[in-house]
Amino acid sequence: MHILVVGLDYKSAPVDIREKLTFQPDELGQAMAQLKEEKSILENIIVSTCNRTELYAVVDQLHTGRYYMKMFLANWFGLSKEDISPYLKFYENDGAVEHLFRVSCGLDSMVIGETQILGQVRTSFKLAQEEKTIGTVFNYLFKQAVTVAKRCHAETDIASNAVSVSYAAVELARKIFGDLSDKHVLILGAGKMGELAVQNLHGHGIGQVTVINRTFSKAKELAGRFSGAAKSLNELQCALMEADILISSTGASGYVVTKEMIEHVNKLRKGCPLFMVDIAVPRDLDPALSEVEGVFLYDIDDLEGIVEENLKERQAVAEEVELIIEAEIVSFKQWLNTLGVVPVISALREKALTIQAETMQSIERKLPHLSTREKKLLNKHTKSIINQLLRDPILKVKEFASEADAEEKLALFTQIFDIEEAAFPDGERQDERQPVHAFKRQNPQGLTSIASE
């Protein structure tokens, strides 16, 4: 059993590739359910955001799992494996656990320390629970990932004053225009990204804000909180005629603003420049807009320069988070170690309790005059003897799980107590059931492992 991550992010793929491989929120549950049916996949969770699409899975074989996860991505989005292979990253076992913890803490985000990703990981985790695509390993691992992120936020300053992609978009506007007090900004999309953009603009004394959203009531609610105006999507062209800056972050699957639309609007703008920032993935703004005179178009990847400044400032804090993550990986591995010995411990307990039950039946046959109270006392104390006798062997077998020769020791243990058949009813050997042994064989070099095809 192995843990495997297959995916791409803003570091490995440009936005024109990422937008082709982004799961829509309403199809994520179906995608997880379908991925679970693929060969080798035992458990899975999909995390898909504007900056990453990643498949997390527990697999029975690394090579097979890697192949079928890659093919699943290609088939789902109607692409060939050759189309997506150059952009994919692979994390295995320890490297996969480390990667999940880094992602959840915001350490792997374009904007270091941003907390939005934690909410997105939790949403995917909850959906996987509802779809029943996860089991023991991922239930534990993703709960720990959330706990690790909360610990990092509480014990370090990683989330303090962390900027967002929306903040970076506003900063880009400030770098170009300087003073924003006489500018009219149009926000397209009233979701979290749009809300953060309005918040940042308001903090920098923007002259006027107009919010447009597919659901007008949401646009009105957001605009009202910041003394802005709200318009319906039908009024988009009119709003574009008045705007100096457009920041777009809808969840649309196609372009919301096209080249043809802006060419029509431009005739009425009389040559006034229009600054446009697209922070949506898939993109809201047609890339062909950059060909229109007077239009200055930027997408999410163009914000990297502003984000770099944030990275330098937060590097020292990031190192503190790395130390917490390393300790938490050790903790997870200790828990994972015990999974391999669970059937051994269960078989030992079952055998001991069977002996105790048979002994009680024998006593009751030989001493028929025993009262109900006396039988209960005898039952209680014989079970107590069993528990005390098993305590040290169980502690010892848990210690075996972390040792290099664990397989040999566990085999000897099951022979001594004559429980091999009960512990492994299907004839499975211990190395087939012990995930951490696989971790040690496949990833001997340390904490991080990014595999290549």
From Swiss-Prot:
Domain of life: Bacteria
Annotated Basic and acidic residues bias: 426-435
Reactions the enzyme catalyzes: (S)-4-amino-5-oxopentanoate + tRNA(Glu) + NADP(+) = L-glutamyl-tRNA(Glu) + NADPH + H(+)
Gene Ontology BP, a term: protoporphyrinogen IX biosynthetic process from glutamate
Keyword flag Cell membrane: no
Pathway(s) annotated for this protein in UniProt: Porphyrin-containing compound metabolism; protoporphyrin-IX biosynthesis; 5-aminolevulinate from L-glutamyl-tRNA(Glu): step 1/2
Site (Important for activity): 99
InterPro entries: 4pyrrol_synth_GluRdtase, 4pyrrol_synth_GluRdtase_dimer, 4pyrrol_synth_GluRdtase_N, GluRdtase_CS, GluRdtase_dimer_dom_sf, GluRdtase_N_sf, NAD(P)-bd_dom_sf, Shikm_DH/Glu-tRNA_Rdtase
EC number, as in UniProt: 1.2.1.70
Sequence positions that bind NADP(+): 189-194
Start and end residues of each stretch annotated as Disordered: 426-453
SUPFAM superfamilies (UniProt xref): Glutamyl tRNA-reductase catalytic, N-terminal domain, Glutamyl tRNA-reductase dimerization domain, NAD(P)-binding Rossmann-fold domains
Keywords of the record: NADP, Oxidoreductase, Porphyrin biosynthesis
CDD domains: NAD_bind_Glutamyl_tRNA_reduct (cd05213)
Catalytic residues of the enzyme: 50
Written domain comment of the UniProt record: Possesses an unusual extended V-shaped dimeric structure with each monomer consisting of three distinct domains arranged along a curved 'spinal' alpha-helix. The N-terminal catalytic domain specifically recognizes the glutamate moiety of the substrate. The second domain is the NADPH-binding domain, and the third C-terminal domain is responsible for dimerization.
Additional observations: During catalysis, the active site Cys acts as a nucleophile attacking the alpha-carbonyl group of tRNA-bound glutamate with the formation of a thioester intermediate between enzyme and glutamate, and the concomitant release of tRNA(Glu). The thioester intermediate is finally reduced by direct hydride transfer from NADPH, to form the product GSA.
Family: Belongs to the glutamyl-tRNA reductase family.
Purpose: Catalyzes the NADPH-dependent reduction of glutamyl-tRNA(Glu) to glutamate 1-semialdehyde (GSA).
Protein name, UniProt field: Glutamyl-tRNA reductase
Annotated organism of origin: Bacillus licheniformis (strain ATCC 14580 / DSM 13 / JCM 2505 / CCUG 7422 / NBRC 12200 / NCIMB 9375 / NCTC 10341 / NRRL NRS-1264 / Gibson 46)
Gene: hemA
